[in-house]
Swiss-Prot record:
The lineage of its organism: Archaea, Methanobacteriati, Methanobacteriota, Methanomada group, Methanococci. Pfam families: SOR_SNZ. NCBIfam families: PRK04180.1, pyridoxal 5'-phosphate synthase lyase subunit PdxS. This is Pyridoxal 5'-phosphate synthase subunit PdxS. It comes from Methanococcus maripaludis (strain DSM 14266 / JCM 13030 / NBRC 101832 / S2 / LL). It catalyses: aldehydo-D-ribose 5-phosphate + D-glyceraldehyde 3-phosphate + L-glutamine = pyridoxal 5'-phosphate + L-glutamate + phosphate + 3 H2O + H(+). Belongs to the PdxS/SNZ family. The keyword Lyase applies. Pathway: Cofactor biosynthesis; pyridoxal 5'-phosphate biosynthesis.
């Protein structure tokens, strides 16, 4: 019988990459640059979100052979993406030994109603969220890590900021109700608004934060972007298109790592922000047609 990983073990792995940067890479060369720059993990995928956005079509799990080549080349953890609800893609990724599965809205959803039952897997999962309800529903399904959805492939951090602020505001409400002894309001919030078990709400109230590691993702393109998200309370950052769509990926990757570690030191962020070359060309969110917004996938 297959032995499933416990929540404790899965969340423990997620904590190992805390305070660090996870970088999207599409080949071994990029993975080595990311490792050299100090990434705590890499996300192996065939197309970064910016390319997926431009090229369109159905975006699926990457070729397992490509993922294995990257795993063989680096000593840091390797993550990979599965489509929302596509539990067979997740089974494949687990079988080849990826360290974490990202059930990602960047890929074309396979199921518009259900997410993967992540408790049925040994591998830990990370999932995106726009607010406290989405975050806690994914945790209830077994996610070991949460990240903001942001709006991937845009180089525009505004949506990640919006999502992190929404999570923080939701947590503040839970804490406030708890401190005022408003148990009935908490129960109603859990049942009707967030649609999660009361036990999760109690855990948030006790910890005064999400029960799992919470990273920023979606639109992070500069060292200052990374530091902004860390100052908002994120535990680390994912950087997708922002590094390898820039003019000098190796230098920018190191700078974002430095800014993430030194997020509360403006003088360090200023220093590492010098002479980075061209950042990726960004997209204003209001220029994206409604049907092309990725963050709305999977609620």
């Amino acid at each position: 019988m297959k032995k499933l990983g416990t929540d404790l073990l899965k969340r423990g792995f997620a904590k190992m990459v805390k305070h660090g940067v996870v970088m999207d890479v599409t080949n071994v060369e990029q993975a080595l640059i990311a490792e050299e720059a100090g990434a705590t993990a890499v996300m192996a995928l065939e197309r970064v979100p910016a390319d997926i956005r431009v090229q369109g079509g159905v975006a699926r799990m990457s070729d397992p052979e490509m993922i294995l080549e990257i795993k063989d080349a680096v000593s840091i953890p390797v993550m990979a993406k599965a489509r929302i609800g596509h539990y067979v893609e997740a089974q494949v990724l687990e079988s080849i030994g990826v360290d974490m599965v990202d059930e990602s809205e960047v890929l074309t959803p396979a199921d518009e109603v259900n997410h993967i039952d992540k408790r049925a897997f040994t591998a830990p999962f990370v999932c995106g969220a726009r607010n406290l309800g989405e975050a806690l529903r994914r945790i209830d399904e077994g996610a070991a890590m949460i990240r903001t959805k942001g709006e991937a492939g845009t180089g525009n951090v505004v949506e990640a900021v919006k999502h992190m602020r929404a999570v923080n505001e939701g947590i503040a409400r839970v804490i406030g109700y708890k401190e005022m002894g408003l148990e009935a309001e908490l129960i109603q919030m859990a049942r009707n608004e967030l649609k999660v078990p009361m036990e999760l709400i109690s855990e948030v109230a006790e910890l005064k934060r999400l029960p799992v590691v919470n990273f920023a993702a979606g639109g992070i393109a500069t060292p200052a972007d990374a530091a902004l998200m860390m100052q908002m309370g994120c535990d680390g950052v994912f950087v997708g298109s922002g590094i390898f769509k820039s003019g000098n990926p190796a230098v920018r990757a190191k700078a974002i790592v430095e800014a993430t570690y030194n997020f509360d030191k403006p003088e360090v962020i200023a220093e590492v922000s010098k002479n980075l070359g061209e950042a990726m060309v960004g997209i204003n969110i209001d220029e994206i047609p409604e049907e092309m917004l990725l963050a709305k996938r999977g609620i």
